[in-house]
Amino acid sequence: GFKANLKGHYYKDNFHEFEVSSLKIWNRSIPVSGGGYLRIFPWIMMKHLLKRYLKDNDFYVLYIHPFELSERECPQLPSSTSASTRQRFNYGRASVPKKLAKLINLLESNGFKFSTFRDLLVERDSL
């Protein structure tokens, strides 16, 4: 089995997994870590979810897909990709840089500091 020594971090041997930040709403786990949810949700909704999450948690995992920050068109998707998936990958991309800046500002105003997973593991090993 996996061991846990930091909240949201699980490991076995040299394999490490960091849990994405999420909220339980109506018995469902809703990710609030960024990525597609940051792109698709309106900022007012994302801000509300983030504030709820930050109230009860002292860590936050942020992730962004590189294509979400690119001004270039999404790379060619396989021809078997459904129209709804194609739409989902493109929807809201123009809003991501502004939302990301707001998200970072919200985290900093709540006392959060930024780090990498590697630095967290080095810090853990030095304890």
Predicted features, each with a name:
Residues 1-63:
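Active-site-adjacent pocket scaffolds in enzyme catalytic domains
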Residues 40-127:
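C-terminal domain-boundary segment and adjacent tail
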